[in-house]
Amino acid sequence: HLFVPGPVNIPDQVLRTLLEDVKKLASRLRSDSQHTIKLLDAYRVFFDWKDYLKKVFRNVNTLLKDLGYPVKPLIPSR
């Protein structure tokens, strides 16, 4: 079960798509790298994407609003 920051319900399909994108990113990082990416490095890379993910969630929120979903604005977490 994925934790979504902010008081908003994002449809499962959107979460699945986002998760697939993260998996593809991880896979690409592995195949592009000449060296073995250590677990901690992978975590560091993932958390470097934190701001990107916030933007993604904000954009998804806007999209859902345009589609007529009753959503509240996302509150960026520290």
From Swiss-Prot:
> Subunit structure, per the record?
Homodimer.
Q: What is this protein called?
A: Serine--glyoxylate aminotransferase
Give a brief account of the tissues where this protein occurs: Expressed in leaves but not in root tissue or seedlings.
**The organism's place on the tree of life at top rank:** Eukaryota
Q: Which reaction does it catalyse?
A: glyoxylate + L-serine = 3-hydroxypyruvate + glycine; glyoxylate + L-alanine = glycine + pyruvate
Which keywords annotate this record?
A: Aminotransferase, Peroxisome, Pyridoxal phosphate, Transferase
For this protein, the Enzyme Commission number is 2.6.1.45, 2.6.1.44
> What GO annotations for molecular function exist for this entry?
alanine-glyoxylate transaminase activity; L-serine-glyoxylate transaminase activity
Similarity field: Belongs to the class-V pyridoxal-phosphate-dependent aminotransferase family.
Q: What induces it?
A: By light.
Q: Where in the cell is it found?
A: Peroxisome
GO cellular component terms, alphabetically, are:
peroxisome
Regulation of activity: what does the record state? Inhibited by aminooxyacetate.
Q: What class of enzyme is it?
A: transferase
The cofactors it requires, by name, are: pyridoxal 5'-phosphate
